[in-house]
Amino acid sequence: LWVKKNGKLTKKNSITKPVDINKNPIIDTSLFEESRLYRPMAGKVYKMYPIETIRGCPYTCKFCNSPDQMKLYKGLGHNFFRKKKIDLVYRELKYFKDVHQIEYNYFWADTFLAMNRKELDAFCEMYQEIKLPFWMQTRPETINDYNIEKLSKVGLHRISFGVEHGNEEFRAKILDRRWKNKDIIEKLKIPHKYGVAFSVNNITGFPTETKKLAFDTIELNRHIEADNANIYSFVPFHGTPLRKMCEELGLIKPETITKCLTNKPILNMPQYSPEEIEAVKKCFSLYVKFPKSRWKVIERAEKNDTEGNKIYKELKQEYLEKYMPK
């Protein structure tokens, strides 16, 4: 907390040691309406609860606040990344299942599989007693046959993976995600081997990105047999390395406050306009699923005019009939 008076800094509290998440009490959900526990998942609605296993993330993606959090606390001799003890995770799971009749758990850790094999085995042994389906999110490089097979046997129902961008050089340099496309493709063949559905998340509209680079993301997704693929506009949040980059490039003012949900892309870049970003997002699923022989028609559907909207409506209906689960 900083306090200013007459334009002068009067007090600056020092940053304290991160909260010990193993000392936190179980959240009292009785404060909220029961209806808030119901959430959709893959076409169904479940009574669902978010469970914390870790806080923070060991990775340093530049669109995320994790790098600055880690750097800030490391400079003070602390570690922002923390894991909850498995017996406490079990206590929460058991409590919400028995007291609130939870039907489905979702683990909201940024990277659920940021754990070693011993920790994974302990989780699976513990979760055998819970016997509820669950969702997790993680990175493609964290999965293997061993952990997905074990998790599938105790209730893993669905996974979300962050792929983010399809150009290897751009992804490494701008996002600090250093993995080969061929490795991502191979890893994402694993979930379906064990009957686990998954989605992939992508982002477009990064600083210095072009529409041509965005099509590398489309191309990568064409080689991944995801149950669904999502794409979102980049948001330059304060406290992230890419926010600093955007300010240095003059793409956003330092005082501009961003929101999680935006009506349109925030960055107005000459090489990749907000209109182009929106067009890529609008037709992303069509480009990913339809054969390339249809791309010229899809390109016309990008246009927000009478003819473009008519073509888009027809393609969307075709997509729903062919590719959406009945």
Language model segments and positions:
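Catalytic cores of alpha/beta
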Residues: 147, 207-223
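Flexible glycine/proline-rich, aromatic-decorated loop/lid segments
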Residues: 159, 249-258
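Radical SAM enzyme core and accessory elements
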Residues: 241, 254-326
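Glycine-rich beta-alpha loop elements in corrinoid/cobalamin-binding modules
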Residues: 1-18, 233, 239
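Conserved strand-turn element in the central/C-terminal portion of the radical SAM core barrel
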Residues: 112, 163-176, 188-213, 232-238, ...
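Short aromatic-enriched loop/helix-cap "lid" or pocket-rim segments at secondary-structure transitions
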Residues: 14-15, 24, 62-64, 119-120, ...
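Conserved beta-strand->loop/alpha-helix structural units within folded catalytic cores of enzymes
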Residues: 56, 196-201, 224-229
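Radical SAM [4Fe-4S] cluster-binding motif and immediate context
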Residues: 29-198, 219
